[in-house]
């Protein structure tokens, strides 16, 4: 069923026993329900900035936009806990070369972005002033482009308010999905919603997106140090060197704000307790080959 409300109605009536598209307005009433499942997904919800636009030429502007976002509020209030706050690009579940958590090892074990939002907001205001735009004065209106599915519209409205706290005027441009992806790919935007779900758990699968010339590099991020680190990671046979190179690449990406991580994906779904033997993977798939339905 393409209509999540119709699917939910069918689930409630017992016509179906499993739905993966739960209407977001129903989530508050489902908290604590054993049939409502939320599990991590190897993916990150992030913002792409069109780095060919002069408005984003100064890294301090990009940092200010990132710091002005209260990620905990976005993930746990706007997204109702169905996402997790993202303080770096590569989230939980991605595996370092020694089998440990790449996320836990990032930046010496410290978050790239402080979880102290009040301090972040003050720093954002100062960075914007340092870039020559005190209280947002002189910075052109930012157009934020997204499609209208799930939480995308409420996130857009939040960003309009959050960046407004910096004195930045933001216009929200909501387009149909069929138009959205080509617009983003062709650079027909200023800031746009983006995201990636991993094909496999090696962090290069996420970081490769930002290599110069990558077809999925919608923001056109290009940095020689980043590219060199990714090339080192791809060519070395030494696992410790490869790990160091991948972490160096993420360090550069985060320092240069090649994108703005917002939240880590989780999958959420409704599954009747009558269903047994199926499982969910962090790649966003459900496996039903050993499933059964108890009568």
Task: Give, region by region, the residue ranges found by the protein language model.
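Ligand-site clamp/hinge motif
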Residues: 1-28, 160, 169
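Ligand-binding "clamshell"
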Residues: 27-38, 186-189, 202-217, 272-276
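Periplasmic-binding protein-like
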Residues: 29, 35-50, 52, 56-98, 155, 213-227, ...
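Structural transition elements
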Residues: 84-130, 149-153
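Ligand/substrate-recognition segments at binding pockets and active sites
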Residues: 115-117, 121, 127-198, 265-267
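Extracytoplasmic/peripheral linker and loop segments enriched in polar/acidic and small residues
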Residues: 116-118, 169-180, 205-273, 295
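Long beta-strand-rich cores associated with HINT superfamily self-processing modules
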Residues: 269-295
């Amino acid at each position: 069923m393409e209509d999540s409300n119709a699917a939910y109605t069918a689930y409630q009536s017992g016509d179906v026993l499993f739905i993966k598209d739960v209407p977001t307005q129903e989530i508050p009433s489902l908290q604590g329900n054993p049939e409502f499942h939320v599990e991590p997904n190897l993916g990150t919800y992030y913002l792409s900035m069109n780095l060919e636009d002069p408005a984003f030429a100064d890294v301090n502007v990009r940092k200010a936009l990132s710091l002005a976002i209260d990620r905990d509020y976005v993930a746990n209030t706007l997204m109702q806990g169905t996402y997790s706050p993202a303080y770096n690009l590569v989230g939980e579940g991605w595996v370092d070369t020694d089998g440990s958590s790449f996320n836990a090892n990032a930046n010496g074990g410290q978050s790239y972005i402080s979880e102290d939002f009040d301090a972040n907001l003050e720093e954002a205001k100062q960075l914007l002033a340092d870039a020559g735009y005190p209280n947002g004065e002189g910075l052109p209106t930012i157009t934020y482009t997204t499609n209208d599915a799930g939480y995308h519209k409420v996130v857009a409205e939040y960003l309009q308010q959050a960046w407004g706290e910096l004195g930045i005027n933001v216009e929200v441009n909501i387009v149909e999905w069929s138009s959205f992806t080509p617009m983003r790919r062709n650079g027909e935007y200023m800031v746009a919603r983006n995201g990636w779900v991993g094909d496999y758990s090696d962090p290069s699968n996420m970081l490769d997106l930002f290599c110069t010339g990558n077809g999925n590099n919608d923001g056109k991020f290009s940095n020689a140090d980043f590219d060199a680190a990714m090339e080192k990671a791809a060519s070395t046979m030494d696992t410790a060197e490869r790990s160091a190179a991948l972490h160096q690449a993420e360090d550069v990406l985060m320092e240069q704000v090649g994108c703005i991580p917002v939240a880590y994906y989780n999958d959420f779904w409704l599954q009747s307790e009558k269903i047994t033997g199926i499982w969910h993977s962090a790649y966003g798939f459900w496996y039903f080959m050993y499933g059964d339905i108890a009568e």
